[in-house]
Amino acid sequence: INFLVDFSLYDKNQNAVKEQYGGSDWNREAFSQQITHAKRQLELMAKPKIKVPRGHYTTYFGPAAVNEILGMMSWGAVSGSSWKKGESALGLLADGAKKLSPKFSLQENFELGLCPPFNERGEISKENLPIISRGNLENFLISSKTAQEYDLEDNGASQYEGLRSPSILPGNLKEEDILKSIGTGLYLSNLHYLNWSDQRGGRMTGMTRFACFWVENGELVAPIEDLRFDESLYKFFGENLIDLTQFTETFPETGSYQNKGIGGSKVPGMIVQDF
């Protein structure tokens, strides 16, 4: 990746819309469209917020929101050690007790060029390692330490066995069809405060953040009050996954705890029923 613009727009009431634009080839028109889109959302944020009653809704997650969910997979889901200890959020998938949608595929993809394909011990990883292919579990991330401990074959994973350069494959949902596909429901641009509420069961909790809206009859109506969700990945990546978007966004790692983070992800948006 050659550039990254990580920005937020605020109005006088401190309502905010957060966006990120990164890639290898700068496209002035695409960046301009993203700014225009963010400005329109900020205008909507000035409207009175709607309190959404507790329930289940058709929900669109923008790529940034999907990226937050994906980040949780590095905390006790894709780890080979967690699997062997019976703690993995994907354990039910590994055991055949739960299924994911054939529309969902996840890879550790160093071909993105977001970080080097070797870990802190200099061990080389495959350039593209399938984790989940069309809903089927293919690989856990297995470090050399875990491989030695459990007599497994390592695949160059880092010692903490988290995703470093993941990508979720896109689907068939066109950008212009997103609101129509929601009908009446939720449009969630960003999430935060995610955590496992039941790690072994694959349930996570979190809260909405920037630019989240109520949608009626295929139109953005107004922003929503912050809300908390608690849902199983076996539902939103499984039976309730309607589709993923045709477009994807790249999110370079921007963390700077102790040192500048490397890596990142490439993900689409997704639309889910009964969330």
Tell me what each language-model feature is:
Residues 20, 24, 41, 52, ...:
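Generic, low-specificity signal for short hydrophobic/alpha-helical stretches with a mild N-terminal bias
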Residues 2-78, 244-251:
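Internal alpha/beta scaffold segment
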Residues 93-275:
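Dual-mode signal for accessory low-complexity, basic/Gly-rich regions
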Residues 79-99:
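Amphipathic alpha-helical
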